[in-house]
C-alpha cells in the first residue's frame, strides 16, 4: 500500500509540475487572485476541486432555478469540451497517420540510396583497378610519347611557317585583314630569331613584302573620310600590331576626328530652343568626343613606357582646343536667352549640359570639362539673376506708370477716382507677388534633382551674395532710389510729380520699413539656406533706408501741396489793388478754394496715414481770432503807425511782441500722421500769405478784406493742425502786417466780420 501511495504522489507531483508549466506559459504565476482561485476547493477548474463541498455549497446558496441554470451551463460546457476533445483527437490521429507514411517513405528512399551507393563503390573499385593497370603498362613508354608529342608540335609550327606567305595572301584576298595580322604577329618573333637560316629568311622576306602591302591598304582606309569610327579603330589597332610609329598614328587619328567634331560645331551655329541646342551639342559634339577619346585610349594608352604619356598629352591638347570652341558657342547661346517666362527650361538645359560633361571629365581628367562647364553654369546663373533684377525694376516702373495714369486720368461722369488705399494695396501686392514669383524661378537652380546644385557656389555664394544681396537687397535699394528720384527730377514732359504719387510712395516705403522688408528677407533666407558666411546687408540698414526715403517723399509732398496753396494765395494778393478796393461784402472765392483744397488734402492723407495727436482744443477755437485782431485792439495798436510823431514807438511795440511769441519753424520735419502733414502744408501756405501781405500797401477796405479772409480761414483751418495756436499766430501776423501797411487803418467791427463769414 505504501508503494502504491508513493506512486500516486509521484504522479500527482508530475501533474502539478505540468500544471505549473502551463500557468507559467499563460502568465499566471503572479501572486493574487489567480492563485487563490486555484486553491479554492469549490472551483471547478481548480486543482483542489472537491465535488462534495461544491454540491453542498450550491444546495445551500442557490435556489432551484439557479441550480437548474448551473446544470444547464455545465451540460453546455461538457458538450463543448467533448466536441473540442474529439476534434483534437481527430487532428492528432491524422497527423500521426501522416507522420507514419512519411517515415515509411523515408525508409524506402534510404534503402534505394544504399543500393546505389553500393553499386557506385563497386564501379569506383573497377575504375581504380583499370587505371593502375594502364599506368603500369605505359610507364616504360611515357618519355618516348612525350618526345614524339614535342616533335609533332614542332612539325606543326614549321608547317605553319612554311605555309604562312600563302595564308597571308589568302587572308588579304578574302579581306580578313585582322586574321592576317594575327598570323604574322604569332610568327614574327620566330622568323626574326631564325632569319640567319636561308629557308626562314626567305619566308620572312615574303611575309614582310605582303604585310607592307597590307599596311598601305590600311593607311588608305584610315585616311578615308567616309570610314566609320569602328573602322578607324580597327585600322589603327592593326597598324600598331604591324609596328607602325605610334605618334604618327595618334596625329592622324586625331586629325580624322577633328573633322567630325568641327562639323558638329558648325551645326550648332543655327539658333533654336535652348534645350534643343544643348541636346544637339551633347548628342553630337560631346558624344563623339567621348567615343573618340575612349577609342583613342583603348588603342594608344595601353602602350608601355612614354608612348602612353605622349598619347595622353596629345589627346588632352586636342580636346582642350576643340572644347574651347564648343564652350564659347554655349556661352554665346546662353547670353541670347533673354526670355524670363519659363526659367525651368534654362535650368533643365544647364542641368543636362552639366550632366553630359561628367563622361568626358572621367575619360580625360586633364581637359577640365567639369570645371569649365561649372564655370559656364555659374556665369549663366549670375546673368539670370541680373536679368531678374532688371525685370523687377522694370515691373516696378510699370506699376508706377499705371498708378500715375490712374491718378492723372480724367474723372468720368458717375465714376469716382480710384482710392489711394486701393492703389497702394494693389501696388504693394503686385510687387510682392512678383518678388515671390522671381524667388520661385531662381530657386530652381538649387533644386535637389539638379546636378550642379551640390556645387559649393550654389550652396553658398549663390544664396547669400547672388539671390539675397544681388537680387532682393539690390531691388529694395532700387525701389528706394526710384522713389527718391521723384523728389529730385521733374516728371515726364517736364511736368512735376503728382503730389498723390509722392504720398503713396511715402506710405509704401514706410510699410516696407515696418514689415515688408523683414518679410521678404525672411522668406529669402528660408528658401535659400546658404552655407556661405560672407557679410550681408542687415535688415536694420534697409529699414533705415526705407524710412529715410519715406521721410524725404513726405517732406516733398508737404512742400508741393503747400506750394499749390501758396500760389493761389500769392496770386490773389499780387493781382488785387488793395488801396482802391471796395468795402468787403463777402469772403473772397480764393479763400473758399484754399479751404476746399486743404479739406481735399485732409481726405487724401487720411486714406493712407493715421490721424495723429493734437493738443487739446479750447471750447471757442473757431472764435479766438476775434480777441486777437479785433477792431478796438487794431485801432489802439496801429492808429499811430502812420503819424510822424511816434513811428519808433509802434515798431518797438511790434518787435517786443515778436520776442514773446513762439517761433514757428515752417519747414520742420513732418511726422508720419495726418495732423503733422496738414500742419506742415498750412504753415507753408500761411507763411507765404504773410510774406505777400508784407509786400503790399492797403487801404481801409483792403485791410478789412484781409480781416474777413483771415477770420474765414481761422474758422476752418484750426481743426486740421496739431496746435490751433499756430494758425492763430500766423493769421494774427497777417492781419497785423496788413494793418501796418495800411494807409488808413480803420478795422471792421467784429460782429460785421462774423456775419460776412457766416453768410460766405
Curated annotation (Swiss-Prot):
Transcription regulation: is it a keyword of this entry? Answer: no
Keyword annotations for this protein, in alphabetical order, are: Coiled coil, Endosome, Golgi apparatus, Lipid transport, Protein transport, Transport
Give the gene symbol.
vps51
Q: Which family does it belong to?
A: Belongs to the VPS51 family.
For the biological process aspect of GO, one term held by this record is:
endocytic recycling
Q: Where in the cell is it found?
A: Golgi apparatus, trans-Golgi network; Recycling endosome
Does Transport count among this protein's keywords?
yes
State how it assembles.
Component of the Golgi-associated retrograde protein (GARP) complex Component of the endosome-associated retrograde protein (EARP) complex.
Output the Gene Ontology cellular-component terms: EARP complex; GARP complex; recycling endosome
Q: What is the recorded function of this protein according to its Swiss-Prot or TrEMBL entry?
A: Involved in retrograde transport from early and late endosomes to the late Golgi. The GARP complex is required for the maintenance of protein retrieval from endosomes to the TGN, acid hydrolase sorting, lysosome function, endosomal cholesterol traffic and autophagy. Acts as a component of the EARP complex that is involved in endocytic recycling.
Q: Which superkingdom?
A: Eukaryota
The parts of the chain that form a coiled coil are 97-127, 374-395
Question: What Pfam families is this protein classified in?
Answer: Sec5
Put simply, this protein is called Vacuolar protein sorting-associated protein 51 homolog
Amino acid at each position: 500500500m505504501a508503494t502504491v501511495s508513493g506512486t500516486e504522489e509521484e504522479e500527482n507531483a508530475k501533474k502539478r509540475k505540468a500544471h505549473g508549466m502551463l500557468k507559467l506559459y499563460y502568465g499566471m504565476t503572479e501572486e493574487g487572485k489567480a492563485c487563490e482561485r486555484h486553491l479554492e476547493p469549490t472551483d471547478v477548474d481548480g486543482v483542489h476541486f472537491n465535488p462534495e463541498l461544491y454540491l453542498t455549497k450550491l444546495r445551500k446558496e442557490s435556489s432551484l432555478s439557479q441550480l437548474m441554470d448551473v446544470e444547464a451551463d455545465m451540460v453546455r460546457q461538457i458538450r463543448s469540451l467533448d466536441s473540442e476533445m474529439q476534434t483534437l483527437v481527430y487532428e492528432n490521429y491524422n497527423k500521426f497517420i501522416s507522420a507514419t507514411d512519411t517515415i515509411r517513405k523515408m525508409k524506402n528512399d534510404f534503402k534505394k540510396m544504399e543500393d546505389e551507393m553500393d553499386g557506385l563503390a563497386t564501379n569506383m573499385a573497377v575504375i581504380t583497378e583499370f587505371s593502375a593497370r594502364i599506368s603500369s603498362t605505359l610507364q616504360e613508354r611515357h618519355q618516348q610519347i612525350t618526345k614524339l608529342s614535342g616533335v609533332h608540335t614542332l612539325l606543326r609550327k614549321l608547317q605553319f611557317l612554311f605555309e604562312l606567305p600563302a595564308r597571308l595572301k589568302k587572308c588579304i584576298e578574302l579581306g580578313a585583314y585582322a586574321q592576317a595580322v594575327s598570323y604574322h604577329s604569332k610568327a614574327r618573333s620566330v622568323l626574326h630569331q631564325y632569319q640567319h637560316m636561308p629557308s626562314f629568311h626567305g619566308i620572312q622576306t615574303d611575309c614582310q613584302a605582303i604585310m607592307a602591302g597590307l599596311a598601305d591598304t590600311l593607311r588608305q582606309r584610315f585616311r578615308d573620310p567616309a570610314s566609320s569610327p569602328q573602322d578607324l579603330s580597327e585600322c589603327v589597332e592593326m597598324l600598331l600590331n604591324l609596328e607602325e610609329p605610334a605618334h604618327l598614328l595618334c596625329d592622324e587619328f586625331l586629325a580624322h576626328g577633328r573633322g567630325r567634331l568641327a562639323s558638329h560645331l558648325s551645326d550648332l551655329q543655327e539658333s533654336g530652343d535652348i534645350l534643343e541646342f544643348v541636346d544637339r551639342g551633347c548628342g553630337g559634339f560631346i558624344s563623339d568626343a567621348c567615343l573618340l577619346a575612349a577609342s583613342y585610349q583603348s588603342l594608344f594608352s595601353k602602350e608601355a613606357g612614354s608612348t602612353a604619356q605622349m598619347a595622353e598629352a596629345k589627346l588632352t591638347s586636342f580636346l582642350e582646343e576643340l572644347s574651347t570652341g564648343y564652350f564659347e558657342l554655349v556661352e554665346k547661346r546662353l547670353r541670347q536667352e533673354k526670355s524670363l517666362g519659363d526659367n525651368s527650361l534654362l535650368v533643365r538645359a544647364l542641368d543636362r549640359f552639366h550632366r553630359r560633361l561628367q563622361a568626358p571629365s572621367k575619360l580625360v581628367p586633364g581637359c577640365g570639362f567639369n570645371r569649365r562647364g561649372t564655370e559656364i553654369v555659374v556665369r549663366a546663373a549670375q546673368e539670370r539673376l541680373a536679368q531678374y533684377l532688371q525685370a523687377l525694376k522694370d515691373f516696378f516702373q510699370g506699376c508706377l506708370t499705371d498708378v500715375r495714369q490712374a491718378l492723372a486720368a480724367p474723372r468720368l461722369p458717375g465714376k469716382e477716382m480710384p482710392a489711394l488705399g486701393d492703389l497702394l494695396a494693389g501696388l504693394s501686392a503686385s510687387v510682392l507677388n512678383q518678388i515671390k514669383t522671381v524667388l520661385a524661378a531662381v530657386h530652381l537652380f538649387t533644386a535637389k534633382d539638379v546636378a550642379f546644385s551640390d556645387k559649393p557656389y550654389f550652396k553658398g555664394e549663390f544664396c547669400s551674395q547672388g539671390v539675397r544681396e544681388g537680387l532682393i537687397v539690390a531691388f529694395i535699394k532700387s525701389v528706394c532710389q526710384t522713389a527718391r528720384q521723384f523728389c529730385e527730377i521733374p516728371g515726364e514732359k517736364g511736368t512735376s510729380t503728382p503730389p498723390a504719387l509722392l504720398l503713396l510712395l511715402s506710405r509704401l516705403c514706410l510699410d516696407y520699413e515696418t514689415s515688408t522688408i523683414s518679410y521678404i528677407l525672411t522668406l529669402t533666407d528660408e528658401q535659400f539656406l546658404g552655407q556661405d558666411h560672407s557679410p550681408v546687408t542687415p535688415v536694420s540698414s534697409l529699414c533705415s533706408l526705407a524710412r529715410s526715403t519715406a521721410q524725404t517723399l513726405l517732406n516733398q509732398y508737404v512742400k508741393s501741396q503747400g506750394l499749390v496753396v501758396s500760389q493761389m494765395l500769392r496770386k490773389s494778393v499780387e493781382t488785387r489793388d488793395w488801396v482802391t478796393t471796395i468795402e468787403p461784402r463777402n469772403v473772397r472765392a480764393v479763400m473758399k478754394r484754399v479751404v476746399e483744397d486743404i479739406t481735399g488734402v485732409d481726405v487724401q492723407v487720411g486714406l493712407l496715414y493715421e490721424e495723429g495727436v493734437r493738443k487739446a482744443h479750447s471750447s471757442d477755437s473757431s472764435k479766438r481770432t476775434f480777441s486777437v485782431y479785433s477792431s478796438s485792439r487794431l485801432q489802439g495798436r496801429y492808429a499811430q503807425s502812420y503819424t510822424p510823431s511816434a513811428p519808433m514807438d509802434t515798431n518797438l511795440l511790434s518787435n517786443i511782441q515778436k520776442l514773446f511769441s513762439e517761433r514757428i519753424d515752417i519747414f520742420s520735419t513732418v511726422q508720419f500722421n495726418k495732423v503733422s502733414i496738414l500742419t506742415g502744408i498750412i504753415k507753408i501756405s500761411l507763411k507765404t500769405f504773410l510774406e505777400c501781405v508784407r509786400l503790399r500797401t492797403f487801404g481801409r477796405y483792403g485791410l478789412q478784406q484781409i480781416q474777413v479772409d483771415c477770420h474765414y480761414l481761422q474758422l476752418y483751418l484750426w481743426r486740421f493742425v496739431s496746435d490751433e495756436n499756430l494758425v492763430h499766430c500766423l493769421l494774427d501776423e497777417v492781419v497785423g502786417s496788413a494793418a501796418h501797411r495800411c494807409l488808413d487803418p480803420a478795422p471792421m467791427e467784429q460782429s460785421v466780420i462774423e456775419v460776412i463769414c457766416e453768410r460766405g
